[in-house]
Amino acid sequence: MKKWLLAAGLGLALATSAQAADKIAIVNMGSLFQQVAQKTGVSNTLENEFKGRASELQRMETDLQAKMKKLQSMKAGSDRTKLEKDVMAQRQTFAQKAQAFEQDRARRSNEERGKLVTRIQTAVKSVANSQDIDLVVDANAVAYNSSDVKDITADVLKQVK
């Protein structure tokens, strides 16, 4: 009797694990991220947000290059010394503004990326719950999957609005 119960329990455990395998799905997060980013126009939003500062930096760079060219053609004297100091100060200001611009742009890009990831994760959870899926794995993290593993990428993309 004890062996029979043990065999029945083992059979039940194997059947449960085989049944759980049916509730696994994959999703292509890279593709989703790219498509959702295009759909929402995140890159255009960021570009418009930083357009003014980028054009100011370009103007500063052009002005600085013109002054450096003028400085190279000048002979030694008080005007040259004054222009050298001006160029050095402008170069330092430009470097500081460029660094601040890059940091702000990277910070905003990360914020927008985080928002997209949150939206995608919420959609993945919603689709997984509606389709009774227990485990969703990124398709790029899977070394092999058989053809019977469900790909919910299209369903998730529809869910993300």
UniProtKB/Swiss-Prot annotation:
Pfam hit, one: OmpH
Keywords: Chaperone, Periplasm, Signal
The keyword Chaperone appears for this protein: yes
Extra remark beyond the main annotation: Does not require ATP for its activity.
Statement: the UniProt record of this protein carries the keyword Transmembrane: no
Protein source organism: Escherichia coli (strain K12)
Tree of life domain: Bacteria
Name of the protein this chain belongs to: Chaperone protein Skp
Gene Ontology biological process: chaperone-mediated protein folding; Gram-negative-bacterium-type cell outer membrane assembly; protein folding; protein insertion into membrane from inner side; protein maturation; protein stabilization
Lineage, highest ranks first: Bacteria, Pseudomonadati, Pseudomonadota, Gammaproteobacteria, Enterobacterales
